[in-house]
Regions:
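Long beta-strand-rich cores associated with HINT superfamily self-processing modules
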Residues: 448-478
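Short catalytic/ligand-binding loop motif for oxyanion handling, primarily in non-cytosolic enzymes
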Residues: 20, 79-82, 265, 276, ...
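Mature extracytoplasmic/periplasmic domains
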Residues: 270-293, 445-452
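Short aromatic-enriched loop/helix-cap "lid" or pocket-rim segments at secondary-structure transitions
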Residues: 83-85, 279-280, 381-383, 450-454
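Surface loops and adjacent helix of pleckstrin homology
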Residues: 14, 73-74, 134, 442
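Surface-exposed binding/hinge segments that line
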Residues: 12, 47-99, 451
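Active-site-proximal polar cores
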Residues: 439
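Extracytoplasmic/periplasmic ligand-capture domains
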Residues: 4-47, 60-62, 106-112, 117-268, ...
C-alpha cells in the first residue's frame, strides 16, 4: 500500500491468490472492476448493499498496472481505509472479472466466484447456503470440509437443533442464554452489542443531493402522522415550523416516550440487556455517557397522550412497522403499550427483507422500522440518513440536513475535537426531532457447544450478520 496524499491510495494486489473454480489469480483488474461496479458514482445502476456507503468517499478506482489498483478519494480521514477495506462492518469481497466476462452477469449472480477459504456450492434463498472448503487455501485451509448455513426463523427450533446437535452453532435470544450456559454451551469468540431502535422513516428533509446538488424528488407523505414536510406550502428553504413538522414532532415524541424500556429488558431480555434511548450510539460510548441525562427518554404515557392530543390525534391512529421475518417480541411489546396507552394500532410488515428492501433503496418507504447502524461515533454513520448513498444504496428512510453536515465533516476531518462536535451535533438533532429513538441494547453472539466444536478464533465485527457466525475456517469438530 502506498498513500501519496489524501487524493489517492495505491494498493498492491497480493500475489498467488486464486479465484475459485479455476478462474485464475486475482489482480488489479479484478479489484478495479469490482469496486467500480458497486460504487454508485461509477455505476448508477449499482444496488450493492455496501457499495452505497462509498458515496462522498470514493470517486473511482483505476488500474496502474496488473498488480496495482489506485483508489481516488473524494474525501479521506483516519477511518477511511479501515472502514472501506475490512469486514468489520460488512466487507466487500473481490469477485472475478474473468468469470463475469466469460459467463455473464446472470451466471455470476448465481455462482459466487471469490477467493475465501470456502467456495459456494448452493444458495437457496430463505432456506440454506452450502459451502465447501478450499484445499491448500492461500491464507487458511479450513478444518471442516463443508459448512451449511440454515435459515431457521423460529427461536425454539434453533434451540432444539443446538440441543440435539442437528446444528453446531446458532444465534439464540438472550433470555435463553443462561439455561444454555447451564447445559454447557458457550458463546463464540467475538460478541457485540445489538441495538433495537426505531427509524421514523418517511422524513426526507434534504432538498438537494449531497454530491451533485440536484433537486431531489421525494414524496413526503404527511398523511402519516410521524412524517413532516419542511417545504410544505412551497419554497426551497428548510422550515421546521410548518404545521406538519410541528405536529409530526409531537407524534414522534409521544411514541418515543411510550416505550417501557426497563420492563422490556427485564421480561424479554431476562435483565441481561439495558434500556436504550437514541439510535446510532451504544450506551458505553463516552459521548453518550457525557450526554445521557440530556438524551435519555422518560416513560411518560400520560404526557405522550397529551402530545398526541395537541398534534390532532386524541383518538390515536394506525401505523405500519416493518420487522421482517425474524423475532419481533420486543416490537410487539412496544406496540401493545402504544395501543393500550395511546390507541395507536400497529400493523407489522413481515415480508422478507429482499422483497421490502427496494423501498428504502428508492427512498419511497414511509413506514417505521429498525434502521441501522451503530459503531464508533467518530465514524460517518450518517451515510444512512442522507443522500450520500443515493442512488443505489441503503438508507433508513430519512434524509436529514444535519446528517449531511455531520457526514461531510466526519468524512474528511482528522481533528478529534471537530469529529466529536459533529457527532454530538448529529445526536442532539436526532434527540430534538425525536427521529431515532432506541428501545433496548443487548449483547449478542453466536452460541455453540464446546463439547462438540472448538472455535477459538474469529475476526471482530460491528454488526450482527449470520447470527454472529463468521471465520468458519477456524471451527474444528471434536
Amino acid at each position: 500500500m502506498c498513500i501519496r496524499d489524501s487524493s489517492y491510495t495505491d494498493f498492491k494486489a497480493r500475489e498467488n491468490v486464486p479465484f475459485h473454480r479455476g478462474f485464475g489469480d486475482m489482480d488489479a483488474n479484478d479489484i478495479v472492476w469490482y469496486f467500480n461496479s458497486i460504487n454508485p458514482l461509477t455505476n448508477p445502476d449499482s444496488r450493492n448493499d455496501t457499495g452505497g456507503q462509498m458515496g462522498g468517499t470514493l470517486l473511482e478506482t483505476s488500474v496502474v498496472d496488473d498488480s496495482t489498483a489506485r483508489f481516488h478519494w473524494d474525501a479521506f480521514a483516519g477511518h477511511t481505509l479501515f472502514k472501506t477495506f475490512t469486514d468489520l462492518e460488512e466487507g466487500m469481497g473481490i469477485f472475478s472479472k474473468k468469470a463475469y466476462d466469460e459467463r455473464g452477469e446472470e451466471w455470476v449472480k448465481d455462482n459466487m466466484i471469490g477467493t475465501g477459504p470456502f467456495q459456494l456450492v448452493e444458495w437457496v434463498e430463505s432456506e440454506r447456503v452450502e459451502m465447501d472448503a478450499v484445499t491448500n487455501h492461500w491464507r487458511k485451509t479450513p478444518y471442516v470440509n463443508r459448512v451449511e448455513i440454515l435459515f431457521v426463523p423460529e427461536n425454539a427450533t434453533r434451540r432444539a437443533m443446538l440441543e440435539t446437535t442437528q446444528a453446531y452453532a446458532g444465534n439464540l435470544p438472550i433470555k435463553d442464554w443462561q439455561s444454555m450456559f447451564d447445559m454447557g454451551f458457550g458463546l463464540a469468540p467475538e460478541s457485540i452489542y445489538t441495538v433495537t431502535q426505531i427509524a421514523m422513516s418517511g422524513n426526507y428533509w434534504e432538498y438537494s443531493h449531497i454530491k451533485t446538488g440536484e433537486t431531489l424528488e421525494r414524496n413526503r407523505d404527511i398523511s402519516k402522522p410521524h412524517v413532516g414536510d419542511p417545504y410544505e406550502g412551497g419554497g426551497t428553504t428548510f422550515n421546521g415550523d410548518t404545521p406538519s413538522m410541528q405536529q409530526s414532532l409531537k407524534v414522534r415524541q409521544a411514541l418515543s416516550r411510550t416505550i417501557d424500556r426497563d420492563t422490556i429488558n427485564e421480561v424479554i431480555l431476562g435483565g441481561l440487556g439495558e434500556a436504550h434511548h437514541l439510535g446510532y450510539v451504544w450506551n458505553n460510548d463516552p459521548i453518550w455517557q457525557e450526554n445521557a441525562d440530556t438524551w435519555s427518554l422518560p416513560y411518560d404515557p400520560d404526557g405522550a397522550k397529551a402530545l398526541l392530543t395537541e398534534a390532532g390525534y386524541p383518538d390515536g391512529f394506525d401505523i405500519e412497522w416493518y420487522v421482517g421475518t425474524g423475532d419481533y417480541e420486543t416490537q410487539q411489546a412496544v406496540a401493545a403499550d402504544w395501543l393500550s396507552k395511546l390507541n395507536v394500532n400497529v400493523t407489522f410488515d413481515r415480508q422478507d427483507y429482499s422483497s421490502w428492501r427496494p423501498t428504502i433503496v428508492a427512498r419511497t418507504n414511509s413506514d417505521i422500522f429498525g434502521g441501522c447502524c451503530w459503531g464508533p461515533l467518530l465514524w460517518p454513520f450518517e451515510w444512512t440518513s442522507n443522500t450520500s448513498s443515493f442512488p443505489g444504496g441503503y438508507g433508513i428512510g430519512m434524509e436529514l440536513p444535519q446528517s449531511k453536515a455531520s457526514f461531510n465533516i466526519k468524512n474528511s476531518s482528522q481533528d478529534p475535537a471537530e469529529l466529536k462536535a459533529a457527532a454530538v451535533d448529529m445526536l442532539q438533532y436526532l434527540s430534538d426531532w425525536a427521529l431515532f429513538p432506541g428501545i433496548v441494547q443487548q449483547p449478542n453472539a453466536a452460541m455453540y457447544n464446546p463439547d462438540v466444536v472448538s472455535w477459538q478464533e474469529m475476526r471482530p465485527y460491528l454488526w450482527m450478520r449470520l447470527g454472529g457466525m463468521r471465520s468458519f475456517e477456524y471451527i474444528q469438530l471434536k
